[in-house]
Amino acid sequence: MIIRSPEPEVKILVDRDPIKTSFEEWAKPGHFSRTIAKGPDTTTWIWNLHADAHDFDSHTSDLEEISRKVFSAHFGQLSIIFLWLSGMYFHGARFSNYEAWLSDPTHIGPSAQVVWPIVGQEILNGDVGGGFRGIQITSGFFQIWRASGITSELQLYCTAIGALVFAALMLFAGWFHYHKAAPKLAWFQDVESMLNHHLAGLLGLGSLSWAGHQVHVSLPINQFLNAGVDPKEIPLPHEFILNRDLLAQLYPSFAEGATPFFTLNWSKYSEFLTFRGGLDPVTGGLWLTDIAHHHLAIAILFLLAGHMYRTNWGIGHGLKDILEAHKGPFTGQGHKGLYEILTTSWHAQLSLNLAMLGSLTIVVAHHMYSMPPYPYLATDYATQLSLFTHHMWIGGFLIVGAAAHAAIFMVRDYDPTNRYNDLLDRVLRHRDAIISHLNWVCIFLGFHSFGLYIHNDTMSALGRPQDMFSDTAIQLQPVFAQWIQNTHALAPGVTAPGETASTSLTWGGGELVTVGGKVALLPIPLGTADFLVHHIHAFTIHVTVLILLKGVLFARSSRLIPDKANLGFRFPCDGPGRGGTCQVSAWDHVFLGLFWMYNAISVVIFHFSWKMQSDVWGSISDQGVVTHITGGNFAQSSITINGWLRDFLWAQASQVIQSYGSSLSAYGLFFLGAHFVWAFSLMFLFSGRGYWQELIESIVWAHNKLKVAPATQPRALSIVQGRAVGVTHYLLGGIATTWAFFLARIIAVG
């Protein structure tokens, strides 16, 4: 008699038709909340409607229902992303000079927007070269399209239609997985399955398919383009895929097919999977064969990683076990209980993801210029500056978001009763030590970094250049950074034997790459000026962290307000009758953190913009002499505050200020308008609620006199609403001002 183990029963992971689709309900504003659904009594109603529409925690306390709403919303988000992408590709297909740019990327600028002449604004259509008039774009899409092997506007058009189909599909999926087949809570909490699928599927197969596309489509097409073949003469992508002989003409080892792979003779593939380092001298971008190799390697790693976790079969890691095994000599219970936190609090999960993704986005910003991945990207200075600035801002916002959701987790999801002596509890118990030390670090960095500048301004004002901190007087060389640069410059042939050049030209080593008479990249010298501004970076980053971390660690309680958790995530003050307790909510810390994030990122992008114009970007003469855009003035000018104001902000603002009457005039208008938006924010930040309520009541009196008073009572913004409106306009105005300043400058001189 054979005893079989009982067959595991198949788990039912979805509920069928849980919630009916009702247009009547959707049409009712505030249907998710009993209070808001009643309709407006006062104008505060519209603010509450916006504040709570996506705060799913406030609609219900059922974790399964919250999870389904978040999951469904993600499909809506993906749908919008596909719609946006489709629009980008459609503009490339319908309104752009892509084919002209492809034939001569060094002399023709990218443009995908032509302004219609309605009130004379066709002045904005500048001459981008090749007889095309339009607005110069700085998104880098042209460079990506070339790298992926797109050779005609018809291909862009087809891709745009494909993206629309996917947008519709995602919209349908969002509806289907909420109204027709909604996953159960257990499905959302099955982290091992999620990790396996995300690692092996999204990252593994995603990278593998991209590597395949690069080898079979991008590489051959780019090889033809680099050789100067007319895009119309190049075979179409499907011809390369279906006809191996075509590829074998370019890469002879293709004739052998998969034999070298199975016989472990992998070096045969080194024609199209390379490890060269450095930049392709024709395009100024990374070698596309290096990139294909990289994606293949990444794919292997993630396909392996996607088989690491224990699911239906009893092998592999369990995440709970891994976390609970993490105990050090100083960490008490270690990560015990972390598994439960991350599977029951999506805020905690989101917080970690935002912190990682924000940091990664900033890493991307730094790699886009130091290892420019796409052809002709490095010499398109406006695009380089835009990509750096964009990724820095996005990274900053994501990191502040991480702190926001960590604080929401602390207020709404943290259960102190069953958390004892684990890592989080231990951090909370010595939060005073953490915050006071961090505060000391901020004061130290602030006084010393700013003090160096003040010293230099004073010496400069007194006419004592020999007593300044500079490369020509008292040197403060960044010796550690220079050592790291040098190590990387020496790496090829030593630590990485197969490599012919270092990972980035910025490390050093002497060689520079120029494309079409413009510098793509060269070794970036670091000196006293960089040492000074890097300490300002350290200062602003630490202050941002201080504010955000204080908000998280004191979100539930503090000496001032021991019962803070009961007041919620955002509240103006601890009730009337307790003075000095305003602006202590977790939300207020996020609010204040945003201003310091703005400070920090502004200094970074100013540093980048000036440093690149001074020491990297420029033109090269026939004799090989490089002339930089601002003639290398960074090292001597940026060491005083006065220098930053005079030689960077003022000197480089001339293009945007003098843009009227030219194709850059829109930037001049934006520069003006965004300053106005920024100034408008101060009205919300520097005035009180009572002032406005008094004003409103006299205006209501006038309406009553004329018998035109509205049924909905006007109310002044609450304290929190006023600060939210204020910080929004502050950031929007500041970012748009910087954008206009940067682009008018770099399009004019780059």
Swiss-Prot record:
Under Enzyme Commission nomenclature, its number is 1.97.1.12
Where in the cell?
Answer: Plastid, Chloroplast thylakoid membrane
List residues binding phylloquinone.
692
Its cellular-component GO annotations read: chloroplast thylakoid membrane; photosystem I
Write out the residues that bind [4Fe-4S] cluster: 573, 582
Q: How is the cofactor bound?
A: P700 is a chlorophyll a/chlorophyll a' dimer, A0 is one or more chlorophyll a, A1 is one or both phylloquinones and FX is a shared 4Fe-4S iron-sulfur center.
Q: Which Pfam families match?
A: PsaA_PsaB
Give the domain of life: Eukaryota
Keywords (alphabetical) are: 4Fe-4S, Chlorophyll, Chloroplast, Chromophore, Electron transport, Iron, Iron-sulfur, Magnesium, Membrane, Metal-binding, Oxidoreductase, Photosynthesis, Photosystem I, Plastid, Thylakoid, Transmembrane, Transmembrane helix, Transport
According to its UniProt record, this protein's enzyme class is oxidoreductase
Where is chlorophyll a' annotated to bind? 675
Q: Which family does it belong to?
A: Belongs to the PsaA/PsaB family.
NCBIfam families the record matches: psaA
The name this protein goes by in its record: Photosystem I P700 chlorophyll a apoprotein A1
Which species is the source of this protein?
A: Arabis hirsuta
Q: Which gene encodes it?
A: psaA
